[in-house]
Amino acid sequence: MVGGMSTWLARRVFAAAAACAIFAACAPRAATFATRSSGMGIDPFGHTRMSEPRASVPPDEMAHTQRLLALLRNDLVQYRDPAAAERDGFLKQGDDVPVGALKHFFKYENFAKNRTHLDPKAPAAILYRRTANGFELAGVMFTAPISAPMDELDRRIPLALGHWHSHRNICMPPKGAPMTTHAQRAPFGFEGTITTRAACDAANGVFLDNVYGWMTHVYPYAPTLADAF
């Protein structure tokens, strides 16, 4: 079981989440590491909720954020090669992604650690950007409980900088359902037309009121502080 889901469902959810996070635009890159993605994209059916932005970062939180970025820059060097991340339990899920898009390598056990606090050494996922020659280290993803208030999210990653988001009211297709045509896929997943439990039940799907709580990406090798989140 992963986060209360069967392993099969968890893997399918992760694959769908990763597919939802593919965006074509690419920001400028540092010399050795990729940087951030282009944003959350369009969500016509309201499955994505964003955190409430704040106007500024208090000095103590800014110091905390700078320490976090420094720790991540130092620790993530060991995962420049995705094979090293996989050896440490970060698993690549879903299909390949196009050049320029992000790929998530998830570590299931770290989701439990993220429930209580943000540990720089226990990200829920490591992010790689697809290149013509493979994958380039980009950053990490952290999570927090869906019940976490804005003040708690702000303590972990300041809301004036970070973009916490949550995926809600998702209907996953039933196991074994054919998903080869657009009509078969359209009702389900993170961009699906189904948004209620009743409609999901009618389609014999698996309804998730949220998927792994709040999430945020951090790009510690970005050229500016604003680009790091």
Model feature map: region roles:
Residues 33-126, 130-229:
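Primary mode marks residue(s) on the alpha4-beta5-alpha5 output face of response regulator receiver
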Residues 15-20:
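Sec-dependent N-terminal signal peptides
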Residues 2-14:
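Bacterial N-terminal signal peptides that target proteins for export
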